[in-house]
């Protein structure tokens, strides 16, 4: 109640989610470099596509089987909102540890899955939600403007990329102010389940697909098996565009918040394990250069059978 006194206090700590999400998207867009090298863009686009279709596919499947009630309390809004959105900070850290410069550079492309844009596309395509074109455009325009400014002025890019780290705590505060303790406690099991589902679909499964496409075992395919903290604000943004989702916002947000913590713990451990396994696998089968790629595909297929 203390946060409802109005003015700047209410605006920042209670009703600030739309503004903070827009600012986060603006900063994210500024980090995308139009001059990025081909390998960086290739990896970034591929990982973004795998993340989106993984979340879209599992969300569509669960909705078709269990309907709006969800699977073991997991709502379709929470599943799609979480699984399609990766934690860029964790990915960048893992890329710096187990990848190369192009993997680190792909982080900027992965920022495209920040915010509600892909979730709206997935829910709308699946027929689960109805979003006016203006709402869809409004969810991506801040990122586009940030992209333009970041590429016109590199100093602004550096400033805005640094500012991204300041925003998640404020997002979390606004989000928590709209939840009850019982909702958070009740999301415990389903939130853990959502986190493990995210790791399974966009961690383990994407590692296999990414490695087959790359024609060598590549642990970075599993590094997108996370849920970004900002994803917890996606249900509120979705409900603003389609009020029919309003009853699901509180529960979905709590589930996504719990999944964020689970994936932040599990995914780095998974990537560390897969990095060791991949190194041994690639050395065993002589992978790593173009002349050996076809052999590598056959070897990976044989290893997984």
Language-model features and meaning:
Residues 1, 9-43, 143-153, 162-187, ...:
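Hydrophobic transmembrane alpha-helices of secondary-active transporters
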Residues 8-24, 70-85, 130-144, 189-201, ...:
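Structural signature of hydrophobic alpha-helical transmembrane segments
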Residues 11-17, 30-64, 115, 179-210, ...:
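Entry/N-cap segments of selected transmembrane alpha helices
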Residues 30-42, 66-75, 84-106, 125-130, ...:
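Juxtamembrane helix-boundary/capping and inter-helix hinge elements in multi-pass membrane proteins
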Residues 39-53, 102-110, 159-171, 218-227:
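Cytoplasmic-side transmembrane-helix entry/capping segments in multi-pass membrane proteins
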Residues 45-86, 192-244, 268-278:
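Transmembrane alpha-helices that form the ion-translocation and gating core
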Residues 57-64, 119-128, 174-188, 231-253:
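Hydrophobic alpha-helical transmembrane segments in multi-pass integral membrane proteins
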Residues 100-104, 108, 112-121, 216-305:
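C-terminal transmembrane helix pair
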